[in-house]
Every structure is written in C-alpha cells, then in structure tokens.
Amino acid sequence: MKVYKSFLIATASLFLFACSSFQNDDYAMNYKGQIGEPIMAIAMLSEQQHEWAGTPYVLGGVSRRGVDCSGFVQKTFFDRFNLRLPRSTVEQANYGKHVRKEDIQTGDLIFFKTGRGPNGYHVGIYVKEDKFLHASTRGGVVYSSMNNPYWSKAFWQVRRI
C-alpha cells in the first residue's frame, strides 16, 4: 500500500509540473497596434496621450522631459504602430499619401500652417470626432478640436501613412 501511495504521489506531481505554465521572455509578445484598425488605433493613441500627458513642449525635444509636435508624432508612430516616420514636420508633410479633409480617418496626420516655429508648420494625429492629438506649445501633449477657430483657420493638409 505504501508503494502504491508513493506511486500515486509521484504520478500526480508529474502531471502538476508538466501542466504548469512558465513564462519565457523569448516568447513574450509585445503587441503593436495596426494603424488601419480604428478601434485599436484609438486605444493606442489614448494610451500614448495618457503616458505623455504633462510633457512640456520643447522645440527639438523627443523625450518626456520635452517634446515638439513632429517628435511626438514620430515617437507615437514608432512606439504604438512600429512605423518609422521622418523627424521634421516638413518631411512628415511630404510623407505618405495626401487625403482630402472630408476623408480623414483615425491615425491620419493633420498639418497646420501656424506661422510659428522654424518652418511655421504644426502636426498632430487625427483621433476621432474632429479631435487630434499633438504636442501643443501651450499645454504639452493634449487633444484639441479641429473646430477650434485657431486650428480651423490654420488647417493645411491631411496625410495618410
């Protein structure tokens, strides 16, 4: 009987350890969203805004100590969608495909002629319902409305990556 109990315990232990899970970092998944999936893209952009909220605007910056508009767009597209974009607003304004304002979709780049900065351009990422995410000179990383008179007047173009 003692041998039988030992056999049962050994067999049960084998099953328990054989079925237990382990985490191997080699197989860990780091999901990056797809810019073409609107719901996922909105969630990814929301996460990025949450992480970068409070980051001040700093011309030429690309870190949480300070970031400018094109740096934030470049960082967001790489961090969230694994896409590499050019660094400057001028280069980003020539990247991808031109899209009519009426056809704007989540993840499109929206450009403005503000007359500020080294080239007078500003860029953000369209989210939904006329809202876009950007690094603002006044509020840092924020959502703004395209319907705001300032942004509406300064609107220039939309590009799809």
Curated annotation (Swiss-Prot):
This is Probable endopeptidase HI_1314. The active site is at residues 69, 122, 134. Residues 39-161 form the NlpC/P60 domain. It is a lipid-anchor. Pfam families: NLPC_P60. GO terms for biological process: peptidoglycan turnover; proteolysis. It is an enzyme of class 3 (hydrolase). Belongs to the peptidase C40 family. One of its GO terms (molecular function) is cysteine-type peptidase activity. It is found in: Cell membrane.
